[in-house]
Amino acid sequence: MDRTEQKSIIEGLLFVSGDEGISPEQIAKVLEIEGNEVIDILEEMQKECEGAHRGLQIVQYAKVYRFATKKEHASYYQKLIDIPTAASLSQAALETLAIVAYRQPITRTEMEEIRGVKTDKALQTLVSHLLIKEMGRAEGPGRPILYGTTKEFLDTFGLKTLDDLPPLSEENEQMNEADLFFGSLQEISK
């Protein structure tokens, strides 16, 4: 087996060993080579990963090697963590989001009439996750705020435009819009 293939296998071993890492001795047993040769290969791989074109580095902790992300990219990893997902939203927020998606622009009062309960907390959550925003004000007493979905909403749910929302058929209009919306999203993502 040549050096390139050995590096490829070691790279895979580092990946599957995860945060626990893997010792040079374990790698040597898998590849059936000497431990000193494994250390030489790991050192070569560490140098190769140091370049700016690589997002991972190979680090050694407590006699094991493992992959780690580069510290200089930490702000990007934090952005990923901060991206809202449907899983991080409560059922109330998801139901409210479905109502906004299908009925926008819509006021808080209209949402509460559809849901039958207050939507203040759900609206706060959706606005803070940048999934909905104020679209303007409705005409009429008090000029209530109108809400609509955002580009982040489309990105989060893998939609190009609002036209990609599954249509509501007449028989389904009696069903819960949130159930229809998220059931349809599951179909889209298959």
UniProtKB/Swiss-Prot annotation:
It is found in: Cytoplasm. It comes from the Bacteria. InterPro entries: ScpB_csome_segregation, WH-like_DNA-bd_sf, WH_DNA-bd_sf. One of its GO terms (biological process) is chromosome separation. Its main location: cytoplasm. One of its GO terms (cellular component) is cytoplasm. Keywords: Cell cycle, Cell division, Chromosome partition, Cytoplasm. Participates in chromosomal partition during cell division. May act via the formation of a condensin-like complex containing Smc and ScpA that pull DNA away from mid-cell into both cell halves. Belongs to the ScpB family. PANTHER family: SEGREGATION AND CONDENSATION PROTEIN B. NCBIfam families: SMC-Scp complex subunit ScpB. Homodimer. Homodimerization may be required to stabilize the binding of ScpA to the Smc head domains. Component of a cohesin-like complex composed of ScpA, ScpB and the Smc homodimer, in which ScpA and ScpB bind to the head domain of Smc. The presence of the three proteins is required for the association of the complex with DNA. This is Segregation and condensation protein B. It comes from Bacillus cereus (strain ATCC 10987 / NRS 248).
